[in-house]
Amino acid sequence: MTDYFFTRFSLDLLCCMIYNLLWKLYNNNEVLKMISAVGSKKNILELPFYNCISDIFESKEIQKLGDITHHIYTTILQHILNVAYYNYIICNFFGFNAVSAARAGLMHDLFYYNRKERVKHKGEKSHCAHHPVLAAENAREVFDVSLLEHDIIVKHMWPMTFKLPKYKESYVIVFVDKYCALLEVMSPKYQKIKNRFIKNKVQTAV
């Protein structure tokens, strides 16, 4: 019971800390840069964190993910790049292992199918429960994956993975993954509404 309350308290505290950090980043225009990265307007490859992941990112196994649609408007490649960057920024801010967080972020969805087209057979786990383990297996076949990175990958869908994340960095990706997915789904919609508003404003002015 004590462990449960400690874990719940830790999660609530981490949520508050990440929320505060994202608010600070927003005020510093950093989140706007990340939204641009989601839409490929910002060359994320020129950012400092790229040195931590370049060997993984440039591999053919990762580049293949650019052909697979993910979260409606983007690709798996773009998504994992976004997650890797947010992992790096947040973990670096809190003094966690930002390098491993970034590298694991780039491997956390290492699977080669469109989740919307996947046929679930009787007895198989759902995509949400299955793909973290598959991604970890695929990553270990190609890259050197540390115990920390492995835990980040297999636990990134917690609580759907049931077992508690073992490291602080593993909790970070739980929230970062969802946050990036939200950005990826909402950003194109926001841009569409913004463009429509600007168009209407121009027409009204004329």
Set out the residue ranges of the language-model regions.
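Metal-dependent phosphohydrolase cores
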Residues: 9, 13-206
